[in-house]
Amino acid sequence: MAKLTKKQKEAVSKIEKNKLYSLKDASVLIKQIASAKFDESVDIAVKLGVDPRKANQMVRGVVALPHGTGKNMRVLALVTPDKEAEAKEAGADFVGLDDYLQKIKDGWTDVDVIVTMPAVMGKLGPLGRILGPRGLMPNPKTGTVTMEIGKAVTEIKAGKIDFKVDKTGIVHAGIGRISFDADKIMENAHEIIQTLIKLKPTAAKGTYIKSIHLTSTMSPAIALDPKAV
């Protein structure tokens, strides 16, 4: 393990060992221990009591963070010509179809989200091996395959994110920036936690939310009390 810097040691010392923090206290503390010279991302990791290998225990969905992510989401709209103006007006960063499909085939994936139309999905199939591992494949369940292209782009730009439990049963999500007020960090975290609770699979047994950790790009993780969120 790499040696901790002086600032990182100071940050660790401010976190009480074995303590489970309330979401409110953790949101204040995460700002106090941040030491980087850039605006760090604030992330949440929620360990769920599910077996994601089983289809009836897969947890995925979307959430509109009340205060956005603080990140400028780069959106590619893969649409037919009749939808291009709608996508551009909504703020899509890249708009088109065949030219961008070719760029992706050539290895270009410099975007955060891709939205498209049902009629175009057939063309994206062969690109699954490129887009899939990067989490960029559009999906009707997350609202990125739709005829309402303008609405989809607007929502993403406003802070709508999609999430999916990984193979270890953890949901990771970026929920803001360290420059956010503690209340905004808390409210964004609360929104995604409540969304996860609503999505609890009926097949999931035992404790559903096993642990929650709040962290920033360069800081150690703060353990939250799942009962105090």
Swiss-Prot record:
Binds directly to 23S rRNA. The L1 stalk is quite mobile in the ribosome, and is involved in E site tRNA release. Protein L1 is also a translational repressor protein, it controls the translation of the L11 operon by binding to its mRNA. One of its GO terms (molecular function) is structural constituent of ribosome. One of its GO terms (biological process) is translation. One of its GO terms (cellular component) is large ribosomal subunit. InterPro entries: Ribosom_uL1_bac-type, Ribosomal_uL1, Ribosomal_uL1-like, Ribosomal_uL1/biogenesis, Ribosomal_uL1_3-a/b-sand, Ribosomal_uL1_CS. Keywords: Repressor, Ribonucleoprotein, Ribosomal protein, RNA-binding, rRNA-binding, Translation regulation, tRNA-binding. It comes from Flavobacterium psychrophilum (strain ATCC 49511 / DSM 21280 / CIP 103535 / JIP02/86). Gene3D superfamilies: 3.30.190.20, 3.40.50.790. The lineage of its organism: Bacteria, Pseudomonadati, Bacteroidota, Flavobacteriia, Flavobacteriales. PROSITE patterns: RIBOSOMAL_L1. The gene is rplA. Belongs to the universal ribosomal protein uL1 family. This is Large ribosomal subunit protein uL1.
